[in-house]
């Protein structure tokens, strides 16, 4: 069904049902990876091994080890690798960062970020055996939950503003509202600490109801 819908938009597009067949094509120079998180590393490494440049949707991978393997493959192959953090291309964010970095707002003493939503992330499933495949964001086997789906945006903005990466983090999360069989938290709270002592906070809930 998804392929049929896509072909309505781009009827002349060539369709592949296996990404490895796409990577074998000499007609392709680069790929865009917008699959669920747990597939990023496998696909990105395979693409670079096949001589393709890669634009990979955020978050990069499930853990630091996987991210490092992707980075080392980029270094070994010389293929361009870019992570799709869309705010890097947003003129509004670019302008604000210019203002921050030129001192318009003074010194950064602290950063507070949040992402609140009212929704369960759940999608309709036509058959029970497809539950974990379709609702992959709800399960730790396939997703890192709010941290990688939403928190990575806020951490990227904070690091961009600070022109540094935090060296300490603490946080906690829980499932307090959507008790529907998922095992990723539906609310989280984190504190990141930079070398100069500035703290970035991030809070997120997906049950922001009234």
Positions of predicted regions on the chain:
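Predominantly a Rossmann-like dinucleotide-binding segment in NAD(P)-dependent oxidoreductases
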Residues: 77-83, 87-182, 190
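Generic structural signal for residues in well-ordered beta-strands
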Residues: 15, 81, 169, 200-202
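Short loop/edge segments at beta-strand edges and connector loops
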Residues: 17, 56, 171-173, 204
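Short, solvent-exposed loop/turn segments at the edges of secondary structure
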Residues: 49, 74-76, 183-187, 195
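NAD(P)-dinucleotide binding in Rossmann-like oxidoreductases
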Residues: 180-182, 193-210
């Amino acid at each position: 069904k998804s392929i049929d819908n896509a072909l309505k938009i781009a009827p002349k597009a060539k369709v592949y049902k296996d990404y490895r067949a796409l990577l074998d094509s000499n007609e392709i120079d680069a790929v865009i990876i917008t699959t669920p998180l747990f597939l990023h590393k496998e696909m990105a490494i395979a693409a670079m091994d096949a001589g393709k440049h890669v634009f990979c949707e955020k978050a990069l991978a499930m853990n630091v080890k996987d991210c490092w393997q992707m980075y080392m493959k980029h270094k070994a192959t010389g293929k361009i690798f870019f992570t799709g953090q869309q705010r890097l291309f947003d003129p509004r964010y670019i302008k604000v960062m210019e203002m921050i970095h030129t001192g318009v707002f003074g010194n950064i003493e602290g950063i507070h970020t949040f992402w609140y939503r009212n929704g369960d992330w759940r999608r309709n499933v036509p058959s029970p055996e497809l539950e974990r495949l379709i609702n992959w964001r709800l399960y730790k086997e396939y997703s890192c939950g709010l941290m990688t789906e939403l928190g990575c945006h806020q951490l990227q903005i904070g690091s961009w503003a600070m022109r540094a990466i935090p060296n300490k983090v603490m946080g906690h999360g829980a499932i307090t509202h959507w008790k529907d069989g998922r095992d990723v938290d539906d609310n989280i709270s984190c504190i990141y600490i930079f070398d100069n002592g500035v703290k970035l906070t991030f809070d997120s809930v997906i049950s922001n109801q009234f």
